[in-house]
Amino acid sequence: MGLFHKKDSRSHDSRNDKAAIRPSVTIDKLSEYSIRSPKLVSDSGSNGHLPRMVTTIPNNVEIPPAPDPATKPAAYLRSIQSVRERSRLVLMRAKSNSLNHFNVDMSKFQETADYVMSIIKRDYAGDYANIPPHGRWQHFEVGGRPRVTQLLQSWPTTIDNQERTRRLIDLFLVSVLLDAGAGTSWSYKSKESGRMYSRSEGLAVASLEMFKAGYFSSDKNQPHQVDASGLKNVTVETLAKGMQVSDANPMSGLEGRAGLLIRLSSALQNPELFGTEGRPGNMIDYLMSHPTTQAASVPVVPLPTLWSVLMDGLTDIWPATRTKIGGVSLGDAWNCTTMPTSPPAEAWENIVPFHKLTQWLCYSLMVPMTKLLNVHFAGAELMTGLPEYRNGGLLVDTGLLTLKDADAKKGLETYQRVTPSNKAVEVVPMFEPGDDVVVELRAVTVGFLDELLAAVNKGLGARLTLAQMLEAGTWKSGREIAQVSRPITKGPPIGIISDGTVF
């Protein structure tokens, strides 16, 4: 990871060398790193692609408004609507270059949009409608190997689509919860192919192979499931074994991941949402029978109904140290000094919510439900861009955002403190997840992703959904520009000390 390159045995400050990473300069070199997101092989008749998710609300599907923050601040900050509304306040300050920790060069915005468009054109020119939505499925298929399709084909034909979807949701939920940043040193060698993978794809392949081996199931006769009793047996040691973690192959946040799965075991003991078995996949039965679900030619589920299952049903999995209001844990929501407040400020006014892992769950779980059961989600446009290090790193690496000097100095001191001297390469400012620098960056990332979607669609003459732009554009662009800017670690320009529960 690094804002700085190692060159001639000296640290080189890439913040002052933006020309080296501008899209127009690097696009030819970047092409060697990327592959087109794989088609998701489906049943015959669907042309190998997922059905498109509903992005407009049918007239007869009512989307409930967010709770009133004045009377129910905790409920409001846990709602999906609050993420965009609160982050937009930070975006407004960014546009006037009045952030606390970053300088904003709006002249770089169009360059950033042009770079994202160049990546999308390179991989999908003339085929924009078939860009898959951002989700965990694509990570499983790294290297062009259709692992999810092969998993589906391995099950007897007597297993109906509802149970197949339950099993995929079991897998996807655990895999997403394990998807926090693993660090730049960890990798995984697939037991099936012998190939090495790292980062999100490595975590995806590792979690899939653990799932197939029955790590998360209490039923020896049915290893391909996740249940509360099976998760009770998870320990740091078993997770380390499954993830191939060792002194020579360290993973950031291993203990945090294990703790998340152990707490998930308790959260799944909710028969109304997850059945008597305590399986994540049983949420399908809850959603299909929910009074807000409309069963017309296809099932139509309001997005807030799925959101409620994940936010309310999984509340107990988040660390006890997370921000609270009135004793209610808010999950991935943090105090931010950039938030405007009205005197006398209420406690909730300083908080900006992100709910990144919950949103990543939503994006990922909608895919198998849409693909196998043809479920449509009304109100999917309430989802936001994901405030994580690839999307945020893109804004920094293109020069749209530049960390202020005092914060850069503080972050570099943290890097030197937590990084062994013999492993200090491509040095970057580093911060804790709750640091005001990180919270401000995440908030402005959510806002700028909305702005980029409008600019990208205008430039391409397309109608991409936000989920499609995340998949084919910003997430991939953030990764590729990082690979060129920091070719050793391929990490983001601002480092996060991962606890395994945020990113």
Language model features with spans:
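Extended, well-ordered protein cores
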Residues: F4, D8, S14-P368, L372, ...
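Long, intrinsically disordered, low-complexity Ser/Thr/Pro-rich regulatory/activation regions
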Residues: A406-M430, G434
